[in-house]
A protein has these predicted regions:
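Peptidoglycan glycan-strand catalytic modules in the bacterial/periplasmic cell-wall system
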Residues: 1, 27-116, 198-202, 346, ...
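Aromatic-capped interface at the extracytoplasmic side
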Residues: 1-13, 197
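Short extracytoplasmic
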Residues: 9-36
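Short, small/polar residue-rich loop motifs at catalytic or cofactor-binding pockets
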Residues: 10, 15-18, 229-233, 419
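Beta-lactam-recognizing serine transpeptidase/beta-lactamase-like catalytic domain environment
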Residues: 32, 183-194, 239-280, 285-516, ...
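Solvent-exposed, polar/charged alpha-helical surfaces in well-ordered, non-transmembrane soluble domains
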Residues: 71, 75, 79, 109, ...
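Small/polar-residue-rich segments within soluble enzyme cores
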Residues: 72-80, 88-201, 512, 529
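Conserved, well-ordered alpha-helix/loop/beta-strand core segments that scaffold catalytic motifs
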Residues: 189-233
Length: 560
């Protein structure tokens, strides 16, 4: 019994911390990494005897030295770690559950190795004992604010507390190990009972993000918000051929290295967390459903009156006009609410809802980032006036990521790819790790995709100053009334611009959304410059061949 209690008394166990997985962009630029550091801890029982074995009777000189040890050790810790000696007295005199001096008391996390070497040097020079260290790496974000709303951050304990760091914390964290051994106040007992369970490092991820494009997107977004005197905004850039997200920018933003200084509105990933009425960009989805059903072609005719009765109210267009005779192409180019609603009335409500669902609206994209909103779409039993509203982008809500992924699936030949942020992963042993599979489904025909691209190209080719050099581009503007969550009424605007290129074989999509602009409010004025700038950089960056044909200009009106 005595031997057992002595063994328990001298048993010493501490955790071995794994290295957290690294995050890099698609080109290997480090977004989040772990740097070597140590956890400083003390053995209060060892300090109380200043290293003299408990089985040895101390001399008077040793007793005097031991009595001074807690104060001396606290002073060394304060000198090297900052603060006052009193701040460390609790740690160096800590007791266990039985009220006895503890064998293990944490002093400070994330201390750099150089500082701990200075502590060891001071302890040795003074002839003091009882301060130790174990692996306790520091999480750093070399890119700072770049993609911080996506990458996220860790808390003081090193656990993911925001963004990808939070949603993939378990995989990134790895599995702690532990080491147990028998020790006296002099240290390990050489032939004692020793066990070692090694830590397993966390999984490292290569993201689909392009850090340089992400930086440009954040800069372009910041400029757009400043010029529009807006509250906030977001940009998402995608490769339409596979659903990979190349940039995901939110403003205002923060520095992942300093999450404690960030406000809640700065840490939001607006691209996935903010749901809003998309406005006229939604007309692309409406036209896609109509063309896929064979109800219209780009040349279909529609008589557009100056106003349209709907549910006891009237639908009007942004610019007042008399009776117009537009093609479907002209309806999209002029962004006619009336023309879109009239066409949509030829579409069965249940069919409309099935297309909205196929396009990925009304449900999270499951991109693997926290706080993703679902948005809302109406039921097939919606009243007629709701169908009118939904056709031109009111009466439903989406996230920027949902809307971007939907348009990507329309223009790429008609195949929806669930958006993804993960390119590849490697586990703690250096072996490839399985990543979530993206879902793909055909949503419209190849023919319908070509017809929608025809209409979107004319939005650009018939406007002044909007094309990008060397590439044919398709686009759609959006200007939606903003629903104020406080009064549940319309207040202010959400202005947007979505662009895809090259239109003959789309590769890159850019969607810019500006919230509550006060200096201009149309998507063309507020959001288009940022989209144009980013597209002109991204296309050559990804080796996309310039267009060989000139942009087409097709009839927007017809003679009755």
């Amino acid at each position: 019994a005595y031997a057992a209690s002595a063994a328990a008394r001298m048993k010493y166990t501490y955790a071995l911390q794994p290295n957290r997985g690294e995050l890099t962009d698609r080109n290997g630029i480090v977004m989040a990494q772990t740097q070597p550091a140590v956890l400083v801890f003390v053995d209060p029982r060892m300090i109380s005897r200043n290293g003299v074995d408990e089985r040895v009777t101390m001399t008077r000189e040793q007793q005097e030295k031991a009595a001074a040890a807690p104060k001396a050790v606290a002073k060394i810790l304060a000198t090297r770690l900052g603060g006052q000696p009193e701040d460390y007295r609790k740690a160096v005199t800590a007791t266990d559950a039985k009220g006895k001096l503890s064998r293990y008391s944490v002093v400070r996390h994330h201390v750099d190795s150089y500082t701990f070497d200075l502590i060891k040097k001071d302890m040795k020079q003074g002839g003091w004992y009882g301060v130790f260290s174990s692996n306790d790496p520091i999480r750093t974000y070399p890119s700072g604010q770049v993609a911080s709303n996506v990458v996220g951050f860790v808390n003081a304990e090193g656990k993911g507390a925001g963004g990808f760091e939070y949603s993939h914390n378990k995989q990134l964290a790895g599995v702690p190990g532990k080491e147990s051994y028998e020790a006296s106040t002099w240290g390990r007992i050489p032939l004692g009972s020793n066990t070692l369970v090694p830590a397993v490092d966390g999984t490292s991820y290569t993201l689909t993000l392009d850090a340089q494009l992400q930086l440009m997107a954040q800069q372009a977004l910041g400029t757009a918000i400043k010029n529009a005197k807006a509250k906030s905004g977001e940009i998402v850039m995608m490769d339409v051929t596979n659903g990979e997200v190349l940039a995901m920018a939110s403003m205002p933003t923060f520095d992942s290295n300093k999450p404690g200084k960030a406000k809640e509105n700065q840490t939001r990933n607006r691209v996935i967390q903010d749901a809003y009425e998309p406005g006229s960009v939604q007309k692309v989805l409406t036209m896609a459903a109509l063309t896929d059903q064979g109800i219209i072609t780009p040349d279909s005719h529609i008589v557009v009156p100056r106003a349209l009765s709907s549910g006891g109210g009237k639908i009007t267009d942004a610019e007042p006009h008399g009776t117009e005779y537009l093609t479907a192409r002209g309806v999209l180019v002029h962004s006619s609410n009336i023309g879109t609603a009239l066409f949509a009335r030829k579409l069965d409500k249940a069919t409309m809802v099935s297309y909205l669902k196929a396009f990925g609206l009304g449900a999270p994209t499951r991109i693997g980032l926290p706080g993703e909103a679902s948005g809302q779409i109406p039921k097939p039993t919606m009243p007629d006036y709701t169908r009118d509203q939904v056709a031109f982008g009111q009466g439903l809500s989406v996230t920027a990521l949902q809307e971007a992924a939907a348009v990507a699936g329309i223009v790429n030949g008609g195949v929806y790819h669930s958006p993804t942020i993960i390119k590849s992963a490697v586990d703690g042993h250096g072996e490839p790790s399985e990543i979530p599979k993206t879902t793909t489904r055909r949503v419209i025909s190849q023919r319908a995709s070509e017809e929608v691209r025809d209409m979107m190209e004319n939005v650009v080719s018939t406007a002044k100053g909007r094309p990008i050099p060397d590439y044919r581009m398709g686009a759609k503007t959006g200007t939606a009334q903003r629903i104020d969550p406080e009064c549940h009424c319309y207040h202010g605007y959400i202005s947007s611009f979505i662009a895809v290129a090259p239109i003959e074989k789309p590769r890159i999509l850019t969607y810019v959304v500006i919230n509550q602009p006060t200096n201009g409010h149309t998507g063309t004025a507020v959001a288009q410059p940022a989209a144009r700038q980013l597209m002109s950089v991204a296309l050559p960056r990804y080796g996309v061949q310039p267009s060989t044909d000139k942009a087409r200009k097709e009839p927007l009106e017809y003679q009755p």
